[in-house]
């Protein structure tokens, strides 16, 4: 992967956290059981990309606000079950969600921007329809793609795979053994009551990437409704003319679709600080218009 030519940019460290504006997503609302499922929406934030900066060494200083919408953390243990039992139960629900999502089509809208100060100086924007075949294999049909003008960074196929995998991350029973999940407590997030877990990979195998961060699990549905973290490991090449591969922090939310919490919205607002300069990156990813296909479509509408 070749690094982009580096423009003359002033080093900046900006914190541009914002709550969701109209058109960017909707905050989480309390789930009043089946009567209000259709009206619930959640904002969804997060993003992951590969940053190619030839010949520079440095580190990303995450600025994405994981605490947005969070109440005070209550460290008391879960009621009526152990933390391990809670993990087993919500992982089982997540497994159902991952399988269910393969029976839907939806629109994926990816917007990545680089900023110089407060001004956008480049962007990547692509919209695609996502579907799955009978074996659960994912396919995309691009309906809109503008000429990329990003400054100082370069998106690759691996970056788009991050968008497909980690921003809408679903922690299944099969994946749980790969991670250390540490119970952190209970927390009110927007209008939901949740359990909070710290997540980190037990071991990073060569050629594989993992999620590292926190997840918030709805205390009634036992499904993830919010996550904040990044994919790991970062790859920093020390040889000259070799690009750095750094992921920013992202935060994501879900929405209720036919009674299940599906990934809905993702955002990054991060300044990546390198040895010579800093690059401010903003990213918004939306997963919208879920439509069930196949034999179960009629049942889902009932």
Language model feature labels by segment:
Residues 1-40:
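N-terminal secretory signal peptides that target proteins for export/translocation
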Residues 13, 50-51, 63, 261:
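Extended interaction regions within the primary functional domain
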Residues 45-56:
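Bacterial N-terminal signal peptides
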Residues 58-62:
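Sec/Tat signal peptide C-region and signal peptidase I cleavage site
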Residues 63-212, 220-225, 230-247, 255-265, ...:
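Structured extracytoplasmic
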